[in-house]
């Protein structure tokens, strides 16, 4: 009986970057940290220049002849590259339409569950289709379904805004919510400080010495 194949459970070996002593090419075209072309120089000389500047020698184009290296702060460069990759991934997120279904007669617990689902979808950048399903004669209660959907929109007004208000679609009533692009400004936040100051009660002025002097003296 042939032996069973063994699976290598070890983590994959991470490819180390070609920097400093790990660069094995004898001749390099070197670009300084400020973009100045240092020309084609020996590997040892390039490493010496990088060490003098307390920076790293980084291989940026291995296929060139000779290979191109740049003198830079590799730690800072790596951080910026990872940041750019995260931003690009975030921008490439494909917006999906997630659906939250319910009946117009829904209890509080189930309603809270639907709110939580919608919040997660909106946080991920997806649109939410809120659907109230009618069965049989329930179709006559469209007004109650619309009230329920508008209540949901109100409870989700911070992370979302209405893209399409409640409307009848076959035997369902639907509403579309989309992630809010700008922060919600509440009425209290709109009030200017000067407007609030008008509401303060101003104390009456205290009598001055001039007013006291003009008061007629008593006959006593």
UniProtKB/Swiss-Prot annotation:
Residues 182-220 are annotated as: Disordered. It is found in: Cytoplasm. IF-3 binds to the 30S ribosomal subunit and shifts the equilibrium between 70S ribosomes and their 50S and 30S subunits in favor of the free subunits, thus enhancing the availability of 30S subunits on which protein synthesis initiation begins. NCBIfam families: infC. This is Translation initiation factor IF-3. Residues 185-194 have a biased composition (Basic and acidic residues). The gene is infC. One of its GO terms (molecular function) is translation initiation factor activity. Keywords: Cytoplasm, Initiation factor, Protein biosynthesis. Its main location: cytoplasm. PROSITE patterns: IF3 (PS00938). GO terms for cellular component: cytosol; membrane. Monomer. One of its GO terms (biological process) is ribosome disassembly. InterPro entries: T_IF-3_C_sf, T_IF-3_N_sf, Translation_initiation_fac3_CS, Translation_initiation_fac_3, Translation_initiation_fac_3_C, Translation_initiation_fac_3_N. Gene3D superfamilies: Translation initiation factor 3 (IF-3), C-terminal domain, Translation initiation factor 3 (IF-3), N-terminal domain. Belongs to the IF-3 family. PANTHER family: TRANSLATION INITIATION FACTOR IF-3 (PTHR10938), TRANSLATION INITIATION FACTOR IF-3, MITOCHONDRIAL (PTHR10938:SF0).
């Amino acid at each position: 009986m042939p032996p069973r194949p063994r699976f290598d459970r070890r983590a994959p070996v991470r490819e180390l970057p070609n920097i400093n002593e790990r660069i094995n090419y004898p001749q390099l075209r070197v670009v300084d940290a400020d973009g100045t072309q240092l020309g084609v120089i020996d590997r040892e000389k390039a490493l010496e220049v990088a060490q003098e500047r307390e920076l790293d020698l980084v291989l940026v184009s291995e296929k060139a002849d000779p290979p191109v290296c740049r003198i830079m702060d590799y730690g800072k460069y790596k951080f910026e590259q990872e940041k750019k990759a995260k931003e690009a991934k975030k921008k490439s997120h494909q917006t999906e339409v997630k659906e939250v279904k319910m009946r117009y007669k829904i209890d509080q617990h189930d309603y809270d569950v639907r709110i939580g689902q919608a919040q997660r979808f909106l946080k991920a950048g997806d649109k939410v289709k809120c659907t109230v399903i009618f069965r049989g004669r329930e179709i006559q209660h469209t007004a109650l379904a619309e009230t329920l959907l508008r209540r949901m929109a109100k409870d989700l007004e911070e992370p979302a805004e209405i893209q399409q208000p409640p409307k009848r679609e076959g035997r369902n009533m639907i509403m579309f919510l989309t992630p809010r692009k700008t922060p919600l400004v509440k009425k209290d936040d709109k009030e200017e400080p000067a407007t609030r100051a008008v509401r303060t009660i101003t104390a009456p002025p205290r009598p001055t010495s001039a007013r006291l002097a003009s008061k007629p003296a008593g006959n006593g």
